[in-house]
Amino acid sequence: MKTILRNLLSVLRRFKMATLLNVLGLSVAFSAFILIMMQVEYDQNFDRGYTDTESIFRVEAMFEDGGQAVICRPLADAFIQSSPHIVAGTLANPWGGDLFFSVEENGVRNTFKEQCINVYPEFTKVFDFKFQEGNPEALQEPNVVLLPQSMAQKFFGNQSAVGKQLKFENGDHLTVGGVYKDYPRNSSVRNCIYQKMDPKENAQSWGNWNYIFYIRLDNPKNVEGLFENFKAHFDPALIKDNSFSWGGSGMTFRINPLPDVHYTTDVKYDQTPKASRQTLMILFAIAIVIVVIAGINFTNFSTALTPMRIKSINTQKVLGGKESVIRFALILEAVLISIISYLLGLLLVYIAGKTEIASLINADISLSMHIGLVLATAFISIATGFLAGIYPAYYMTSFPPALVLKGSFGLSPKGRQLRNALIGVQYVASFGLIIGATFMYLQNYYMQNTPLGYDKDCLLYTSPSPRDCS
């Protein structure tokens, strides 16, 4: 092993420029791969962090002219009671806005503004809240709220938050009843204040469609026929006004698996962040192509160095070195260079997290949040070094010493064929990425700069919530 490391250091000193280009190319490729895969991982795992995620569904109202993510409260209440397979059902009103309140700690009063969402108490059961302290049934009580752990620490430091009060200017207050573990960014559950919904709020209003409706089933297979069973046994006499009727509305319920909501784009009033499965596949392919291009570039550089290294290799053969040992040393040399590039790539990712690049990615790009991806990329770096080094290693050691006297391997037919093939694949992949990026830029430029016939700076646009329209 000492001999292998000594040879590696000798190669690094002798071929500084080639080594530098290899390390820079691979490190940039690995860092780009990690950043792209962070975004892919973020979208693929969206809303998959709950217990029995496959049993959670969002109920959406679908009409002949389109769908919407909101529903009226009495219809949701009737649906929850319609089947024994519904373990828990909840409504959430995301249109409530922010709360302005103060928290007094150690004689100092600090003012905060935080989002508050009114929900059914069963909200914590549907999404299986992990409580750090407090009573899981706290939302059953009026004027009691739940805080995420990060918010509780911001308000009260390391002291217990349960029993503390959020005070308002008019003298009213809310009491903290529980602290739950923060949810990751790629979650429909927001890390905000949760308060029990007023039991009388739109309880009999069939025309007030303001609420997001979630249910948890005892078994995801029981989703089949859930709406048909509800509609067959629904009593129209429950409808107390003329703002809603089954007849003529063409309405049905779509019971959408929660992980699919992230990719659902055909409903209105949906505040869940969106992504496209096709885009994820494209990003994944781009990440792989970037690493492949860097690996081919590494192989090509190693092959190009053959004429300058073959004398040293043949000298080792003359001195009794076995071909298998020499090949192993050459492959290990490539693997070590790839690992060094990988470590430098991690440093580039860390630096990117401190720059504006972080704003281009929805995911948290801190390496500690993606241990699995970091380890997977480490394995890919080893595989890249092995695959990029195995061909040059075998070619460098497969020719007799007489070849050194006759000419250069780099100019031999085999050498030219290998290098031409590698360069061809590399150019095709590179040009493909360049052309794709160019078309995306031109399309984006066209959408942003094409004259529309009016002055965009003088036009105001607003999208009212269902609450504003009711």
Region locations from a protein language model:
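Membrane-helix entry/capping segments
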Residues: 2-5, 10, 14-15, 49-50, ...
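Small-residue-rich transmembrane alpha-helices
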Residues: 31, 254, 334-401, 442
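Intracellular coupling helices
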Residues: 5-17, 21, 25, 294-337, ...
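Short juxtamembrane loops and helix-capping segments at transmembrane helix boundaries
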Residues: 39, 44-53, 191-200, 263-271, ...
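Short, strongly hydrophobic transmembrane alpha-helices
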Residues: 14-42, 419-443
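Mid-to-C-terminal secondary-structure elements
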Residues: 119-132, 145-275
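Alpha-helical transmembrane segments of integral membrane proteins
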Residues: 22-25, 29-32, 284-300, 333-345, ...
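Structured, solvent-exposed hinge/loop segments at the ends of secondary-structure elements
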Residues: 33-162, 168-175, 228, 358, ...
